[in-house]
Amino acid sequence: VRENVYVNCNKYYTILIFITMLFEISDGKKCDIFVHIFNHLKHFTDSIVLTVSPEMLYIQGMDSGHICVYELMLQSDWFQKWEVDNKQTYGISVPILNKILRICSVNQTIIIHSDNDEDLQIDFTSEEKGVLNKYLKMPLMDIDTDHLHIPDTEYDVDIEMDSKKFKNLIDELSNFNETLNIDCDGEQLTFESSSGEGTMNVIITTDDVELLAVVEDKEIKASYGIKYISQMCQFYKLSSTCAIHITQDIPLQLKYVIDGDSIMRFYLAPKISND
């Protein structure tokens, strides 16, 4: 396996560090997206296994209640520099990584690299005059985890709509209940939230969204926890649109296409009726 050389210089000395993994994000918008992901991932988990390979950065995990699965795939060409020769895994504390990433200033490049099994090094650099370069290090965690196999599924309802619009809709529905009821009679799709304080019904038609496709004559009644959907919607900045896929009695899928084949998606288990 080829080892790459990372050089860190200043006027006093030069240090050559033989690294086993390095990736870099210099595009300002992509830096914001990367920071945004971990800022909101902390609401699902305290720790992750970050897997890097020559092809991509991959994260998969489940919330503590085993209700929601999250999955992130950032292809190698999404990064401005990607130097990974073989598959490697890193156990990461999400709160610590989020704390570090929030130190990154506007117009700084994010460089993440490692040369051992104990630490992950994160550099924030800039060629702009007056912007201080920052070099941080965080300890790695020993985490045992297996990736879930998520089979491809043909859904009965496919919706594509503005991400911010969907987030606002879920925020409004959450005012009335902790449960989102979805009803489809083959012709009309309804989102409902109801409690003793009132009921909110939203009828969704093809005129309201980018795409609405329903299997002909298919009737669906499904319920999901609004709190989880609301947390999933916090990632709306990843993409201008989101895709929602629904089939009765199987997990709802919410997907953001970040760029090309780089995506983030969630699978949310339906609530089980007591009837």
Model-derived features with residue positions:
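DNA polymerase sliding clamps and clamp-related checkpoint/processivity subunits
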Residues: 16-42, 47-175, 181-275
